[in-house]
């Protein structure tokens, strides 16, 4: 059996072909979309779980050493892994919210895969993370369809990371490929996510058109300018139809992070001062919520930084605010804060005001956010997205006949207006915002494997 597999920054999804019609496959109970999240007792549990419960072995000596270290660390902590210790999707989020202090929780590991400067052991660990998530999806699909899944087309962004170029992209794709192989896929093909989304839109065209696909996901924004229509449908070689690609690691997560920073971090000390009158360092308020930046997370949650936070607390003019920031450190609450901002962003698409409730276990903080405050907070990210749209048109040397917007963040009226202002007078259409990439990947899988 072959599938299209969208290993997304925010959600994972899979689809099959039923004749000429792609169909999403339920992968989390009756849901077609599973949040790209994982929870475990410890970081080391991921590698050991793959080996003990799924019989997935490391592919090289680096992975073997990682596994040995993981087993030793868990033994020292007295942790014996049982079958439900590793959970995914909504279950992972629920477990984290129940016990943030004693839960290792990861959201959107795809955001880290192209980061430059990773050590071999870090790359091997990310491969284990991705392998665990892919194995879970594969098992869910096989249980649902009662068939083995051996062939897969996996979506990938134009650029995985803002820096690193081809080297970054190759690193990320290699991690995905190795993880998929270890998960049990035999034949693996990659396709650009905006191209896949475009294939789904192309199936509705009755005449040839030049289409600008704008795919705004959780972690990346990708634009592809493509000639599409009846004369291209079903062709395995689309190189002549691809006019331009632009992409950057900015997406819905960045909107949420910026909104968190601008509107939710003041009760934790942002903008406050030490007794000498100097403002608190901005990085202490950015790093805990930069959930798509592995280095920022590592720096904030380091033991050395806890000493720095306690020092700032002693010198603070408003020590009660720094005490809250220390609680963010101790209870790993960065993800929770960003989630609150995400909920506010969604609500403010339809409301002029939203009241956020931050549950810090010891207290509940309530903050009102106005829509214009939200728009101001995401302005810089919005401008970068608009630039990718204009760059694709310039690179392609022609204006599109139509703009097709897709991706989980593309339903935002604010972002749709941004694209319309960049290319006025050109019709803008939307499809299945969450499912277009996945169903397009299934269409490409049929071309590759049927």
Task: Name the predicted role of every residue range.
Residues 146-158, 276-278, 392, 396-408:
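Short glycine-rich phosphate-binding loop at a beta-alpha junction
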Residues 1-22, 93-213, 234, 320-340, ...:
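Nucleotide/phosphate-binding catalytic cleft detector across ATP-hydrolyzing
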Residues 35-41, 61-71, 228-360:
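Phosphate-binding glycine-rich/basic clefts of nucleotide- and phosphate-handling proteins
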Residues 1-118, 251-282:
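Early-domain small/polar-rich strand-loop-helix modules and first-structured segments
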Residues 105, 125-134, 168, 190-191, ...:
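Phosphate/oxyanion-binding active-site loops and adjacent basic polyanion-contact surfaces
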Residues 183-191, 417-443:
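Conserved phosphate-binding/catalytic loops in two-lobed NTP-binding clefts
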